[in-house]
Amino acid sequence: MAGLLSTFDTFSSRRSESINKSGRGAVIPGQRSTVSVFVLGLSVTDDADKLFIATTFLAHSLDTDKRHSQRGGFLVSLLAMAYSSPELYLTTNGVNADVKYVIYNIEKDPKRTKTDGFIVKTRDMEYERTTEWLFGPMVNKSPLFQGQRDAADPDTLLQIYGYPACLGAIIVQVWIVLVKAITSSAGLRKGFFNRLEAFRQDGTVKGALVFTGETVEGIGSVMRSQQSLVSLMVETLVTMNTARSDLTTLEKNIQIVGNYIRDAGLASFMNTIKYGVETKMAALTLSNLRPDINKLRSLIDTYLSKGPRAPFICILKDPVHGEFAPGNYPALWSYAMGVAVVQNKAMQQYVTGRTYLDMEMFLLGQAVAKDAESKISSALEDELGVTEAAKGRLRHHLASLSGGNGAYRKPTGGGAIEVALDNADIDLETKAHADQDARGWGGDSGERWARQVSGGHFVTLHGAERLEEETNDEDVSDIERRIAMRLAERRQEILQPMEMKAAITVSIMTKMTIPQQ
């Protein structure tokens, strides 16, 4: 029997391995699009010209009249300006099954009177029409930088801070857009300016060169439509982390942004491991958590098999990234979130009200996290030499810190709880509770969740397999008001028949007690 159970425990990981390592077939190339990339030639030496070209690339990438592949090419051209050999940069990091990059040089000819003396050319020929298209008049639908609204002069910044700092400020912001562009597009603008603040405080990004919100949204839309651009940026991070140590200041700043990009879209997976498994509480022995634990073990093997690209599987849209959705291990995720909201106050703002939330496991996680005994790690007792007296005092302190009120946190965000209320039983426990009107429920939407669950009744929600990562943009207070109104409506539906029945009973009793004349 033990062998049979062992086979079942390893089935998920072995099944995934057999699918991913199935028989080799013929390699059939897919369709590839051609993307034009422009690099600076040796004749472009003036810093003002270089900064002008960089802002020209940025402006073209935001031009909605151009195809997204062209706009993506201009962003690649901008990113390549950070390197002394853009061709080598693209050869190292730009190998992609979707696109083929065609490189054009931009040279400066002092004899030319039009297009500011710039000419687009290759080794064999010059491209006059392309030059006109690239450097011709453009109408920006909105300012590129917030400083343009304040009439700030980029040339002045160039004189004060120098070309590398100005170019670095622009390129770093493009990288910051990637942090939220793929996994949380709804919160892109807010997330961008939150991440940018650290770079503004340390002087990396000057105020006059801060992107406008429209610029951020425009770059984000290009990234979402051009997976080849995202792949290039990820490969750049992988190369920095594994193959180089002599990084420039700009590359070090890119690495800092890369730390925000790592494991983007995998917050639920990582939090389940952190709060659900690594806490090593006794609840993990429950049989209904066993399938989810096996699933998580299989996902860990899959994650590690991806090597240095593992932290970017969601951004790269790896075919396996959907397997990491919490809907694939709902009971363990719900339990982990219960532990998390008790142990980490910041996690109380995390969106837990999802369609696959198992309310019973969510409350169980909170209960075991509050239990003073479960907070003590037996594995470290002997190693640290903790005495029984010390453990007793520690339990006393933990119990006093818990407050002893037994209040449970309610799920935040999402529509899962609202959906469940239509089918949930509402316990009208006491007379005082029954006399409370609907206005009282709406005014204190958290009261019902703050009481311990009575009668052993839990609202349990299951289902959903799609990836729903961090969606913190929805107004939680608005959701709570809607939940309170829904509860009030349900309560009124239950109370009205009871009140009518009570009125009829009182009427009958009154007639029976009135003496006949």
Swiss-Prot record:
Keywords: Capsid protein, Helical capsid protein, Host cytoplasm, Ribonucleoprotein, RNA-binding, Viral nucleoprotein, Virion. Residues 440-461 are annotated as: Homomultimerization. GO terms for cellular component: helical viral capsid; host cell cytoplasm; ribonucleoprotein complex; viral nucleocapsid. GO terms for molecular function: RNA binding; structural molecule activity. The keyword Ribonucleoprotein applies. Changing residue 489 to G: In strain: Mutant F1-R and Mutant F1-R / T-7 revertant. Residues 462-471 are annotated as: Interaction with the phosphoprotein. InterPro entries: Paramyx_ncap (IPR002021). The keyword Transferase does not apply. RNA binds at residues 180, 190, 195, 260, 350, 354. It is found in: Virion; Host cytoplasm. Residues 1-404 are annotated as: Ncore. Its main location: virion. Transmembrane segments: none annotated. Residues 405-517 are annotated as: Ntail. Homomultimer; forms the nucleocapsid. Binds to the viral genomic RNA. N0 interacts with the phosphoprotein (via N-terminus); this interaction allows P to chaperon N0 to avoid N polymerization before encapsidation. Interacts as N-RNA template with the phosphoprotein (via C-terminus); this interaction positions the polymerase on the template. Ncore is globular and carries regions required for self-assembly and RNA-binding. Ntail is an intrinsically disordered monomeric domain in the C-terminus. Forms the helical nucleocapsid (NC) in a ratio of 1 N per 6 ribonucleotides, protecting the genome from nucleases. The encapsidated genomic RNA serves as template for transcription and replication; encapsidation by N is coupled to RNA synthesis. Forms the encapsidation complex with the phosphoprotein protein P. Before encapsidation, the newly synthesized free N protein, so-called N0, is chaperoned by P. Belongs to the paramyxoviruses nucleocapsid family. Most abundant protein in the virion. Since the viral RNA genome consists of 15,383 bases,there are 2564 molecules per encapsidated genome. This is Nucleoprotein. It comes from Sendai virus (strain Z).
